[in-house]
Design a protein with these regions (language model features):
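C-terminal nucleotide
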Residues: 8-46, 59, 141-213
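Conserved short S/T/G-enriched processing/targeting/catalytic segments and their helical context
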Residues: 4
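Gly/Ser-rich oxyanion-binding loop with an adjacent helix/lid
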Residues: 1, 10, 28-157
Length: 213
């Protein structure tokens, strides 16, 4: 059991501060240029806000990217399908930066850096699940993850004659322009109210019996 789709890239370091991005999935946009001195999200930057955000997030973690790069991406994850194409770009960028600059980070760290970039740079209040699944995924296994503690274990999946089917609903899904942030805020409000009467750290700590009381 494994998704046979993904995001792929080739990159090269530059001797200056320029950042040049090209996606074969958005070839109509051509090459989008920026620089290490301009790590500010913008509508004009389009999809490159994701790799730029990761470069920014590494800097926030004390790992400065000291030279620019040329990055070409190609992916077959349907955009807006809920399969985390943006998170895959973030994790892939993290892999490339780790390789280029020798940053001492684990795959789990790359997931957290991707989440940081999405939360603080792209202003989407996502959780860790998408980036974690991409960075830590293992063939023929699901991941049982406690997102509050990041404790996890692999759960082998042997489907035999069964299949997991991903269907296209033709409904585009993007966290940035969806009700995600609103739903997240509602859950946080509910947690704060519940914490006034029960001792829980997350909504996941609330068992059914206590809830029914």
């Amino acid at each position: 059991c494994a998704l046979t789709i993904g995001t792929y890239g080739v990159a090269r370091k530059r001797n200056d501060n320029k950042l040049r991005f090209y996606s074969m999935n958005f070839d109509q946009l051509g090459v989008i240029e920026s620089s290490l001195d301009d790590l500010v999200p913008s509508k004009e930057a389009n999809w490159t806000n994701y790799p730029k955000g990761v470069i920014w997030a590494f800097g926030e973690k004390g790992m400065k990217v000291t030279s620019g790069m040329d990055l070409l991406l190609n992916g077959n994850i349907p955009n807006g399908s809920g399969l985390s194409s943006s998170a895959s770009v973030e994790v892939l960028t993290g892999y490339i930066l780790r390789d280029f600059f020798g940053f001492d980070v684990t795959n789990q760290d790359l997931a957290l850096i991707g989440q940081l970039s999405e939360n603080k740079y792209n202003k989407v209040n996502c959780g860790i699940m998408d980036q974690f699944a991409i960075a830590m995924g293992k063939k023929d296994n699901a991941i049982f993850l406690d997102t509050a503690t990041l404790e996890y274990e692999y759960a082998p999946i042997h489907l035999e004659n069964a299949k997991i089917v991903i269907a296209c609903s033709n409904k585009k899904r993007g966290l940035g322009d969806s009700k995600y942030n609103e739903r997240r805020s509602e859950c946080e409000t509910a947690l704060a109210e519940l914490q006034q009467v029960v001792k829980i750290k997350t909504l996941g700590d609330l068992d059914e019996e206590t809830f029914e009381k």
